[in-house]
């Protein structure tokens, strides 16, 4: 069957701490404009959970859209309570992880509701070898239930390790996912110089998604060419060691040979106010906007 229109649902568009920032709001006299705006009806789009998206993919099977979650961080469960309930999303066909930071993996334990509640026997997790090893070390019971303590009720996962340098298929879903390796700061090994820390973006059909990066290698940029929808990291206006600034994101998009029809920034800090950013980005040559939690964008596979 012909594949149809698929949807990307923004589960979260904020940095690791999310927005609003509790330390801003507990000041005797709060002054953070973004955090204060998030408490008002007109500023509600400033409420941001950890960066994550849900892809609802029409793979041409004639069945329901396949639900593919990208990242399952600290705010996953509260985000799911909001967006899964609103859109009647139950089954998770796949979870793909970009990297091993807390805002990408620390909500995985909450996936137990899907497997302990007999909604599905297991959840398929797609990740790099590095991310798998971090999960194995940090949450050993997720990898082997024999490591469980207490009552022993733990989520059931089916891990699939993919290579960062070649496309991979998802079980029972007729689509290909292309990893987009990008730099996301550095890490340190004692006695050695700092090493580049790689995070994965992903291309699915005509949509490329990069949630965390400070540099896109030429080989990755080439894989993104031809994307009509591009979601890209843009933490704030000022430079930052592990994330694109607004200027860097703009310059990267401008460097693409094929101009995307739609660009969305994501991963904001509380230095970024949504309504002001809409106006700021509206003057760019390439149609660009700040994504917000709950926003839905169409793409094609």
UniProtKB/Swiss-Prot annotation:
GO terms for molecular function: hydrolase activity. Pfam families: Lactamase_B_2. It is found in: Cytoplasm; Nucleus. The keyword Hydrolase applies. SUPFAM superfamilies: Metallo-hydrolase/oxidoreductase. GO terms for cellular component: cytosol; nucleus. Keywords: Cytoplasm, Hydrolase, Nucleus. This is Putative hydrolase C777.06c. It comes from Schizosaccharomyces pombe (strain 972 / ATCC 24843).
């Amino acid at each position: 069957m012909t594949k149809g229109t698929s949807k990307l649902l923004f589960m979260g568009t904020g940095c690791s701490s999310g927005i609003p920032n509790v330390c801003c709001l507990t000041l005797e006299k709060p002054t953070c404009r973004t955090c204060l705006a998030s408490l008002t009806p007109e500023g509600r789009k400033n409420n941001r959970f950890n960066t994550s998206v849900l892809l609802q993919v029409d793979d041409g099977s004639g069945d329901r859209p396949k639900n593919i979650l990208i990242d399952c961080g600290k705010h996953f469960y509260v985000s799911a309570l909001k967006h899964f309930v609103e859109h009647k999303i139950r089954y998770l066909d796949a979870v793909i992880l970009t990297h091993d930071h807390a805002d990408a993996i620390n909500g995985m334990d909450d996936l137990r509701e899907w497997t302990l509640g007999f909604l599905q026997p297991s959840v398929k997790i797609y990740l790099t070898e590095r991310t798998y090893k971090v999960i194995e070390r940090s949450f050993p019971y997720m990898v082997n239930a024999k490591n469980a303590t207490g009552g022993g009720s733990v989520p059931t996962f089916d891990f699939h390790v993919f290579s960062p340098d070649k496309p991979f298929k998802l079980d029972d879903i007729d689509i290909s996912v292309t990893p987009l390796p990008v730099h996301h700061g550095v890490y340190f090994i004692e006695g050695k110089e700092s090493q580049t820390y790689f995070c994965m973006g992903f291309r699915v059909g005509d949509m490329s998604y990069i949630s965390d990066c400070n540099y896109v290698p030429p080989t990755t940029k080439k894989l993104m060419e031809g994307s009509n929808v591009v979601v890209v990291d843009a933490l704030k206006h000022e430079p930052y060691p592990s994330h694109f600034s607004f200027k860097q994101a703009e310059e990267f998009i401008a460097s693409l040979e094929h101009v995307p029809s739609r660009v969305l920034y994501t991963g904001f800090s509380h230095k970024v106010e949504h309504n002001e950013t809409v106006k700021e980005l509206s003057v760019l040559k390439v149609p660009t906007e700040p994504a917000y939690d709950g926003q839905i964008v169409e793409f094609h596979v």
